[in-house]
Amino acid sequence: MPGEVTLAHEVGKDFMPVTGGSQVAYVLVEARPTEMMAQVRMPLNFVLVLDHSGSMKGAKLKNVKEAVKMVIDRLEPTDYVSVVIFDDTSQVIIPSMPANDKPGMKAAIDQIRDAGGTTMSLGMIQGLNELRRWHIPNAVNRMILLTDGVTYGDSDRCRQLARDAASAGIAIYPLGIGADWDEDLLDTVGQLSGGMPAEFIRNATDALSIFEQQLQSAVDVAIRNTTLILRLPVGVSAKKAVKVLPIISDLGQSVLSDRQVVIPLGDLEKDKPQSVLVELMIDPRPAGLFRIAQTELSYDVPIANLEGEKIRDDVKVTFTTDANQSAAVNANVMNFAEKANAHRLVTRVLEEYKRTGKATTRLAPNVTRVLDEETQAALEQINQGQQISQEQVKSIGNKTRKLTQRLDDVVP
């Protein structure tokens, strides 16, 4: 039935100049559940996979245990939950079950002690097994994966397990606590599974709020298996696609082909848009109104037993010889483009720094102006050949991918 999701777009310029050459056009596409879905609450099939190695000793483990108990308290009886711990072995301390015996579950959490090394794949295997134990109709299947260290010799196995999770409809949401975890691996695990890049828990005391956000994200899921397609007419090609909300993520070349762009969006959460910025190249056109793309969103509404629902929208621009008309730009779209570019360049600086201990990429003032003072100062240190901490590296990456969550600096 219609009305569960809105599909909207904005273009960088509604009026483009008639020229003799090809031109770049930005299209910002947004998908969002409607108010019709505001009261939807699908059951959760949740596993928390927790590193309890020796390096978790003290405040980190203490705060994580309190955060896990908070999650248990907030689950509904229709939710299933399990908890797996790992060091260089793994153990299921709460097998997957309905969230009924909360005192018993929390007592089991209190018994977790720090010990051993870090072999993350063992925890992931047990976690996936727990999620597969039950067939729960319409459930949101999700793994929260927390670690504070570098896994030992099993990174490729972790990546393959993330692919296996995606095939089973299980999204992994990694959390890194402290400064010593492998952000490249955790980001990849999250993205390969259809989840998110790693969230950085900078201070142990932040664990409670981060776990609360993760739980709320799962509770808010209303639409599943969402895919955005842009179909392009002759004379229009796609150069780049970047997810810009809820975070910035370069989608790479795999989503692009000659005549269409196919972008898996996964779950849509209530009141939270997912937005994609697509850069198109348009061949010369005479004056007039032209369609430069057709957008299509396919999605499932599990609560209504609907699969493969579709909505479409035409993206049009006017080519004009009026210089005043073609000079106008959409500030909102260009703000997203500016921040996506800032994320790309900062990511390049961090990659260079992690690889060589220095960076040759320099950021222009129009890039640095959208960054906070801490990030600017750390990047300046890198440019001057100085070292920054692993904590700063993780903080910069985490904050830069969230630049678009703050759009109050739009220039009209």
Describe each PLM feature range:
Residues 234-244, 302-306:
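Short aromatic-acidic-glycine turn motif
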Residues 269-288:
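Low-complexity, intrinsically disordered segments enriched in Ser/Thr together with acidic residues
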Residues 32-34, 231-233, 281-283, 300:
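Solvent-exposed residues in well-ordered beta-strands and their adjoining turns
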Residues 2, 7-225, 286-287, 369-372:
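Exposed acidic/Ser/Thr-rich ligand/metal-binding surfaces
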Residues 246-272:
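Extracellular adhesion/glycan-binding regions together with long Ser/Thr-
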Residues 10-15, 212-213, 259-265, 279-280:
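Short structured motifs
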